Regions:
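Acidic/glycine-rich phosphate/pyrophosphate-binding loops and surrounding catalytic core
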Residues: 34, 50, 61
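An N-cap/entry alpha-helix motif that binds or orients negatively charged groups
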Residues: 1-45
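Alpha/beta enzyme core
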Residues: 2-5, 15, 53-113
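Extracellular/luminal Protease-associated
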Residues: 44-52
Length: 113
């Protein structure tokens, strides 16, 4: 694979979206995506599974907006499950981060119970 150097990169601070007239009504816009064959989101947003980003509060907020929050794994298993339950109590979709070790397989099994 040939790596081509990036000549220009932009961040959010480098771009401004200027509103303009449009014939399209907000009620006519569909931002939904099929994340998987059986999982559709109203908005194409998944929160990052980082300890400074997603616990139950963020997962609930993004879930209410139509996306999905992914609870990070930098918690002990029971605390991660508690965060997941807080989101599920709101009847929202939620994801959970797990690693690839045997211990993380046990984490995944505990989360799925």
């Amino acid at each position: 694979m040939i790596m081509v150097p990036i000549k220009e990169a932009l961040t959010f601070d480098d771009v401004t979206l200027a509103p303009k007239y449009s014939e399209i009504l907000p009620s006519e816009v569909n931002t939904s995506i099929n994340l998987t064959k059986n999982l559709k989101l109203k908005i194409p947003l998944l929160s990052s599974a980082m300890d400074t980003v997603t616990e139950s509060n963020m997962a609930i907020a993004i879930g209410k907006a139509g996306g999905i929050g992914v609870i990070h794994r930098n918690l002990d298993i029971q605390k991660q499950i508690l965060e997941i339950k807080k989101v599920k109590k709101q009847k929202l979709l939620v994801g959970a981060a797990v690693g690839a070790s045997i211990a993380e397989f046990d984490r995944a099994k505990a989360i799925l119970k």
